[in-house]
Amino acid sequence: MFRQSRWDEPLIFELGNKGRKGFIVPEPEEEVKRKVGGIRIPEKILRKKPPNLPEVSEVEVIRHYTRLTEMSYGVDNGPVPLGSCTMKYNPRIAWEISNDYRINMLHPLQDERTIQGLLEILYELQKWLANITGMDYCSLHPAAGAHGEFSGILIIRKYHELKKQLDRKSEIIIPDSAHGTNPASASMGGFKVVEVPSGEDGNIDMEALKSVVGESTAGLMITNPSTLGLFEENVVEISKIIHGVDGLLYYDGANLNGIMGYTRPGDMGFDIAHINIHKTFGAPHGGGGPGAGPVCVKDKLIDEERNIWLRDLLPGYRVVYDEKTGLYKLVNNEKYSIGLLKAFFGNIVPLIWGYTYILMLGSKGLRTVTEQAVLNTNYFISLVKDIRGYDIPYGKDRYRKHEVVLSAKPLYDDTGVSAEDVAKGLLDAGFYAPTIYFPLIVHEALMTEFTESETIEYIEKYAERLQEISTIAYSDPEKAKEWPLNTSVRRVDNVRANHPKTLAPTWRIYMEKVCRKYSEC
């Protein structure tokens, strides 16, 4: 029986009392004072009033966050089968290495000669990611997946700008099964988004694609395998069509876990690809990061006369090895690069996780990762495809790659029990829910992804719970609409929780809204 803790726990800012301390900074020794001249901060840079931080003891902090973890759920508690998120186990050895003081105490403004070990790690990671994706050069600069996408879009923009054709290259084509960040990234990059529909088989409708490709096409963004878990079989032909109008093909690496070691985006004809280190390569993610979204490119010549290559457009810094000096260096083509998109080199900690993950597994191990992930998903399909109330659009007997999208539309039509109700029913039994209502082309969608980390036994239990939910929905639908009862938080008012007037992602925003509402603080 699953029962989650339910604490009436205030926010950390609401805890504590004036004068309470968790840590007292010791006075420096006399010898230290003599050498550095004391540790007093100059008055001219002191705050005029103390920061608005809670004054709490160490034990209060420990108890507070322990209670919060008891009311939460993550990959350490159990599988998190969120589709297109690749929530795999985060190896502890990678945590140990990334937390080593020889890494986390480095400063980005240190002399390059003093961080040669770190630069060597980043240099090797660049090469490995280029090899895995079939690209030629990588920048580790972008901070996350959508950041990597935006980098790729800016590279496409710069490419056409350097070729003096940006005035007419105004459109980015995106399939209707794409991640929502794709059209957002393209729009932020100044392009018009042109949506192309999926065909009856779930892949891109080739005739529809041909009808929208033209002289205004700047590029196409695609995830392969798609959010439906289907491999885009026409990808080589798509590449030829886009390149035929001097467009660039962009690979969203969110679903790389479904093909890693078997095929590579570069071999399919892609010019640019981003990689989610926090998905495919075992770094933690969720709660806003930190993630890492390296972007890689083929070594495509842009302008022979000026000797400009696609690699010159990469953001931030790349690490290169100088054979003459035997040193690793950070380089950036300031003249043609799309520039810095964040401070310094990138999010180093998740990059160290990714480096460790690849180093541990090797090429054979990475291939096995994909094999196991694909096998897990297809085993799950075999268990649920005939359960009453669920459908698998685009062919329930077709093999998928890393994930599958179930539809609870038959269940909803028959009983009124929705995909959201199904998700709540899973939560009520201690299972994490899949991604729901996405992709938009599947009604009452339940996008489910079991990574290589999961066991047969757990997948079977998950399928059994989906069967139980179906049985209850058809016999007592009102009961199904009451879930969850066993979780820390029960049903919430979705509209109120997401409304701009009530949404407060931070304490400061919350206090500002309280002040405005009650005209006092």
From Swiss-Prot:
Known catalytic reactions: N(6)-[(R)-lipoyl]-L-lysyl-[glycine-cleavage complex H protein] + glycine + H(+) = N(6)-[(R)-S(8)-aminomethyldihydrolipoyl]-L-lysyl-[glycine-cleavage complex H protein] + CO2
Pfam families per record: GcvP2_C, GDC-P
Q: Does the keyword rRNA processing apply?
A: no
UniProt keywords, alphabetically:
Oxidoreductase, Pyridoxal phosphate
Q: Which GO terms describe its molecular function?
A: glycine binding; glycine dehydrogenase (decarboxylating) activity; pyridoxal phosphate binding
The reply to whether Oxidoreductase figures as a keyword in the UniProt entry is yes
Needed cofactors, names only, are: pyridoxal 5'-phosphate
Q: Which residues carry this modification: N6-(pyridoxal phosphate)lysine?
A: K279
EC number annotated for this UniProt entry? 1.4.4.2
Q: Supply one GO CC term from the record.
A: glycine cleavage complex
GO BP annotations, alphabetical order: glycine decarboxylation via glycine cleavage system
Question: Which InterPro entries does its entry note?
Answer: GcvPB, GDC-P_C, GDC-P_N, GDC_P, PyrdxlP-dep_Trfase, PyrdxlP-dep_Trfase_major, PyrdxlP-dep_Trfase_small
Relate the protein's function as given in its record: The glycine cleavage system catalyzes the degradation of glycine. The P protein binds the alpha-amino group of glycine through its pyridoxal phosphate cofactor; CO(2) is released and the remaining methylamine moiety is then transferred to the lipoamide cofactor of the H protein.
Family named by the database record? Belongs to the GcvP family. C-terminal subunit subfamily.
Cited NCBIfam families: PRK04366.1 (NF003346)
Could you describe the subunit structure of this protein? The glycine cleavage system is composed of four proteins: P, T, L and H. In this organism, the P 'protein' is a heterodimer of two subunits.
Give the HAMAP family listed for this entry.
GcvPB
Identification of the protein by name: Probable glycine dehydrogenase (decarboxylating) subunit 2
Species per Swiss-Prot/TrEMBL record = Staphylothermus marinus (strain ATCC 43588 / DSM 3639 / JCM 9404 / F1)
Q: Which gene encodes it?
A: gcvPB
